[in-house]
Amino acid sequence: MMQAIKSIKKHKEKKMKVAILGSGNGALAMAFEWSKAGHDVYMYDFPQFDKQVKAITAAGGIYSEGKMEGFQPVKYAGHDIKTCLKGAELVFAVGPAYSTEPFGKACAPYAEKGQIFVVCPSSCMGAILFKNALGLNIEDDSVIVSDTSTLPYAVRIIADGKIAVYNRLGGGVLLATLPSGKNDTVYDLLKPVNVCVEKAKNIFQTCLQNANPMLHPCITTLNAARIEGPDDFFFYEEGVTKGVGRLLKAIDEERIALGAALGLEIESDPHISIRQGYLTEENYDSAYATSPGFKGIKAQTQLDYRYYNEDAGFGLVLWVDLADRLGLKIPNVRAMLTIVSSIMGRDYKAEKARTLDTLGLSGYSIKELLKIL
């Protein structure tokens, strides 16, 4: 392992092979930026997601406008995971929470000793799930698996093989690693390109610093009739009022309390969002409604969307599970999960998409996990 770490230090000074798993908004932005930094980028996605893969292959790379501009080449975009992983020094898994395990399982037969994998963003302790999917115990150090608290970009695909980057974050993207003793190694590797990364204490911190489960289900629920109605509206500009903001604040305070119970300092979302470049005010209503970082984002056209299925079905479920283990009430988080489940006609908590048990951690106490992670 020491030899692998020594070689990583050299990688910062030379061209690396960087693999990107995924072909969504964030994956294209990550591929663009690492190619722009002079590295050889290889992209993989599953065969059913071939639209962007075909476009990138045809163009030979990715076009971008906004905060990152121009064209950057991609060495390979396709469905052969072995081609992407072979000899890759750095591998990013970029996608929603439900993509983490499939990506890990796809990598399992081809992962090489000493490789670094980064789940970006973690969403819900993604590094642990990814390591499980590789078939490795969380304490195994034959490969390094990290995750981040959020994406380094606000980005949308605006045409096949083309993205618009609205915000390239300048800070506030937390990074944690399994094993935690290797976090400095991964941080030093990422920092020259992803300048926004900051060191987290552990995987719990990257999980809880992600505020999407606080934001998206709440705003969606309090605007459910508008979403199901005939007219479009702007999700943040029109969807966040003073009343909505009060509920956001209550949920955020419970998220911060979860972190405190684990010995972690979790920043309020308005505070870290200012550092990230999303907000210009530190409050829970006008900050979101008037923020240039959220301007022009239309609401989803149906409730059956990732704001419920991912952010509640994975995120809030994990928060409630952690609270149960810690003996915390978090009444607003629990109420939100119950209401969302009723709206969708399904029991997200009973589905257990993401819990300590499904992460393979049921045999550990919280005290043991804090020591291991």
Protein language model annotation of sequence segments:
Residues 97-161:
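Rossmann-like NAD(P)(H) cofactor-binding subdomain of soluble oxidoreductases
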